[in-house]
Amino acid sequence: MKARIRVLCVDDHRLVREGIALIISGTRDMEVVGAATTGEEAIAQFRRHRPDVTLMDLRLAGAVSGVDAIKAIHAEAPDARIIVLTMYSGDEDIHRALVAGATAYLLKDTLSDDLLRVIREVHAGGRPVSPDVKALLDARSGQRNLTRREIEVLELVAKGKRNKEIAVLLGMSLETVPVHLKHIFAKLDVTDRTAAVGVALRRGIVHID
């Protein structure tokens, strides 16, 4: 008898984990071997179970994000097959996950049959990319990336911080903040802080918890 595909489910919402377990329990070729709610647990559970496929959300409880967990797992097991299953559809979210080592990227509104199909395809060595994800990545390829410092500034702008507060929190001069904002506006093709935050949230460049 052919061995079942062993799946690890990482999500901080119990209903999601239980829903995925229910979907997989209805198959003959898969089984859930472990579950985790945080990035730290995800890494530990991966080490313990060595699953064939891991389903990973991006936003998790705890200090270790989904992307960080993917990086850590991929560093230990370069052949790990990880499918991101999340509600975040921004091109930057997708890019960061794939660069970290994710094999595929799915949204939580994916039909159960499609989820099972992708699990099987990834287990077989495939790297499926949906048309929607491909379109977002293609559109992203023509855009300029923000620097780490610019993202830090933008994260604080998204939290409602003014220039003086940003300067203090990031240890920079007050005069430097507008320079960063000018570069951010140009790269995001906007003219003000509100528009910059809107674009950044939509694309997944920053998140507000």
What are the functions of these language-model segments?
Residues A3-V16, I20-I24:
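Conserved acidic segment of CheY-like receiver
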Residues D12, A63, L85-S89, K108-T110:
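Conserved active-site segment of CheY-like receiver
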Residues A35-V53:
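Acidic, metal-coordinating helix/loop segments flanking the phosphotransfer/catalytic sites
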Residues T38-E41, G62-D68:
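Acidic catalytic/metal-coordinating carboxylates
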Residues A44, V67-D79:
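Short amphipathic alpha-helix used as the core "switch/output" element in two-component signaling
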Residues D57-L58, T86:
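Active-site residues of response regulator receiver
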Residues E92-V99, T103-L154, I205:
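Short, flexible helix-to-coil linker/hinge segments that flank and couple to helix-turn-helix
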Residues R162-A195:
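Recognition helix of helix-turn-helix DNA-binding domains
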